[in-house]
A protein has these predicted regions:
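N-terminal pre-catalytic "stem/leader" segment of glycosyltransferase-like enzymes
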Residues: 1-58
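Acidic anion/phosphate-binding donor-loop and adjacent secondary structure
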Residues: 88-90, 116-117, 130-145
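Conserved catalytic-core segment of nucleotide-activated headgroup transferases in glycan assembly
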Residues: 133, 142-189
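Short alpha-helical donor nucleotide-sugar binding micro-motif in glycosyltransferases
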Residues: 194-199
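Aromatic "clamp/platform" in nucleotide-sugar-dependent glycosyltransferases that forms part
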Residues: 207
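Short hydrophobic beta-strand element within catalytic cores of glycosyltransferases
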Residues: 224-227, 234
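A charged, aromatic-enriched C-terminal amphipathic alpha-helix characteristic of glycosyltransferases
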Residues: 267-301
Length: 302
């Protein structure tokens, strides 16, 4: 059996994705483990790991670090989860190493296009991620009163531009009587399935996403998903994954007006709200589970 080591962290999306991948890959004859990149490892540990594993998988910036520790290029694979990953690697190391390592992948077509824009000659494989649908499945709420953020409230991109815009969700929801915003911190990924019990809808207000776990998880949990057309939702939204909100950039009022209209409608029409949640959940069942996406990872890692 092929042995793969994900050099990653056990927090946020990285932990969620790589733990799930390790379970799924085993079904296809690939043994996968996780190595915490927040820890230091001795030269002897690196040597032993190199003798044990056939392939080391991490993001573009960390793959250079592994090479410096002694892992040879023919055992290195990188998968970019965001534009930031590729831009940091380019800033520190240029684009040459993409041609030297064994495999180069990205998690979405958005990033495949960005790789070309960034001057990376090697064409990456697209390896989208999924979720465990049954883990997130919940009965939809009976009515719409509680709104949650889809991901972080505030984040600036590589060019110092605010891309999450959680403040727009807050200022919009505060103006709608009977609807409350559920504030939350950065939860460990293992807390997220139960988190969706505390909200009736999830809003993604980003102007930039590479993929988008929150809209997938919320859909599987039977929550109303409202999102700008970013990441996976650019395709999944029109196909049945939720309600598409205008990007509202630079005119943020377009986003706020559309969000208000949708929330008020589903707040006042409970039957329509429940049916919409059920439709979104069924779309998630048919499209988001790891069983729909694991083949691309197996092919990539083999």
């Amino acid at each position: 059996m092929k042995k793969v080591l994900f050099y990653t962290q056990n927090r946020w999306a990285f932990g969620s994705i790589h733990h799930a991948l390790a379970k799924e890959l085993y079904k296809y004859g690939i043994i996968a483990n996780l190595l915490d990149w927040t820890q230091q490892y001795s030269p002897e540990e690196i040597r032993l790991l190199n003798d044990t594993y056939d392939l080391f998988v991490t993001n573009p910036e960390a793959v250079v670090h592994l090479n410096r520790l002694g892992i040879p290029p023919n055992k290195l694979a990188t998968v970019a989860h965001g534009q930031w990953d590729m831009l940091l690697a380019r800033r520190d190391n240029g684009n040459i190493f993409y041609n030297e390592i064994s495999k180069f992948g990205v998690v979405s077509n958005v990033l495949k296009e960005k790789a070309s824009e960034f001057g990376i000659e090697r064409v990456p494989d697209v390896v989208p991620f999924g979720i465990h649908f049954d883990l997130f499945y919940r009965k939809p709420s009976d009515n719409l009163t509680r709104i949650g953020y889809g991901g972080a409230k505030e984040t600036k991109n590589f060019f110092d531009l605010e891309i999450k815009r959680g403040h727009l969700v807050k200022q919009t929801v505060e103006k709608i009587p009977g609807i409350n915003l559920v504030e939350h911190g950065f939860y460990n990924w293992m807390c997220m399935p139960a988190y969706y019990n505390s909200v009736d809808a999830v809003v993604v207000s980003s102007i930039e996403e590479s993929a988008g776990l929150p809209s997938m998880e919320a859909a599987a949990a039977g929550r109303l998903v409202l999102s700008t057309p970013v990441g996976y939702f650019a395709e999944n939204g029109p196909a049945g994954g939720g309600i598409i909100l205008p990007l509202g950039h630079p005119d943020e009022s377009e986003f706020c007006s559309a969000l208000t209209e949708s929330l008020v409608f589903y707040q006042q029409n409970s039957d329509a709200y429940v049916q919409k949640c059920l439709d979104i959940q069924e779309f998630a069942r048919e499209n988001y589970d790891w069983s729909k996406h694991i083949a691309s990872w197996v092919n990539f890692l083999s």
